[in-house]
Every structure is written in C-alpha cells, then in structure tokens.
Design a protein with these regions (language model features):
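Charged helix-capping and loop-helix junction motifs
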Residues: 82-83, 130-139, 160-164
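Short secondary-structure boundary segments
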Residues: 47, 123, 149-151
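Proline-aspartate-enriched helix->loop->beta-strand connector
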Residues: 40, 118, 134-151
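Core dinuclear metal-dependent hydrolase active-site scaffold
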Residues: 1-42, 49-118, 126-133, 176-199
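Accessory terminal helices/loops
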Residues: 144-145, 149-199
Length: 199
C-alpha cells in the first residue's frame, strides 16, 4: 500500500485493492495549496468544511471497501462550536488504516482504534486537538505507524495552526519521506513526516 500526502489532511491510499482519498480540500480553502484533481474508488470526508469535503475534485469509479465510521466532535464542546467529526477506519490490503479527521475532543473509548497499522492524526491545534492531545491518543491507541496532519508549514496552512516541530521533538523513531510512503505488514513501528505534499 502506498500513502500519498496531498497536504493538510488529504491522503490518497493506493494498492491492489484500489484507491481511497481522505478529506480532499476545495480550491483556495487552504493557503498555499493548489486545487486537487484526483481519481479514486472511494472518497471519505470527515466533515463538511471546505478544507475537507472536495468530493467534486475527485473522479470516482465506485468500488466497495470495508469502512467503519465513528462519530466524534470537532471541538471540546460536544460539537456546539464546530460540529461533528467522523473518524474513518478502513481495512485495506489487510492493514487497518485510521484517519481521525478534524477531531477536537478526547474520546473515552478508543478500543476500535487500538493497534491499527496506520494512524493519521491532527496535531495543529486551534481547530483540532494539539500535539499534547495527539500524543495522548497515540499512547492509548498504540499504532504501528503515526502520520501527523493538519498543521502549518512554511509553505502552506492556516496561520493559527502550530507547526509540526513540537510533535517531531516529542516523537520517537521519526522517518522522513518525500510525498509517498510504502506500507506493508513488515513496515517497522515509526512516526512518518512527509517533506512536502504532492500538490
């Protein structure tokens, strides 16, 4: 399985099972990122904000996948500030992939997320959980591969978001890749930081 990062919270996973796109962003919704034009068999959007719901930017050839959805909140106030958020758990090539979307709360029960192969988790704060909260989730979920998302870089992102620097400093076994990560059953436990988005 290959995991391509298109910036912000948008990932494309591809393999023999097909292609799934998570949280594509609308044109001009994320400063510094160009509009998307992708192809997939399934598009999964965690919520309906423009930086996560650009289904119109993905040409879809439908195919069935095993997907589990967990409803959570986009804030610490049971959704009263920013609404609901959906966590997607995908069974892809016998790997358990979890995309946390724009989660902004701490869940009491993470049993369905535990021991996943890949965890994509926001770290930028303000709109979502921050680095401190993300690290608490990671400790509880115990994923094999952690991919931080929804943060600010020098080239793109919202000014109110934190960068990934604090997260990197507090993470172990950090690996840097360009814009694509190959994952299989033998991939070692690590935190993966993409050097740049494919955009």
């Amino acid at each position: 399985m290959n995991i391509i990062w298109h910036g912000h919270s948008c990932f494309e996973i591809t393999g023999k099972d097909g292609t799934i796109v998570f949280d594509p962003y609308q044109a001009n919704s994320v400063p510094g990122l160009n509009s998307l034009k992708l192809k997939a068999n399934l598009v999964l959007c965690s919520h309906e904000h423009d930086d996560h719901n650009a289904r119109n930017c993905v040409e879809v050839a439908p195919k069935d996948f095993k997907v589990t959805c967990i409803e959570t909140y986009h804030d610490h106030h049971q959704g009263s500030h920013r609404g609901k958020n959906t966590i997607h758990i995908v069974d892809f090539e016998d790997l358990k992939v979890v995309h946390m979307g724009d989660i902004g709360c701490m869940m009491d029960d993470v049993s369905k997320l535990k021991n996943c192969d890949v965890l994509m988790i926001p770290i930028g704060g303000y709109y979502t959980i921050d680095t401190k909260e993300a690290l608490k989730y990671i400790e509880r979920i115990k994923p094999r591969i952690v991919i931080p998302m929804h943060y600010r870089s020098h080239e793109f992102g919202y000014d109110v978001l934190s960068t990934n620097e604090e997260f990197i400093q507090q993470s172990s076994s950090v690996t840097y890749v360009d814009d694509c990560l190959e994952v299989n059953k033998d991939t070692k436990k690590q935190t993966v930081v993409y050097k740049k988005p494919r955009n």
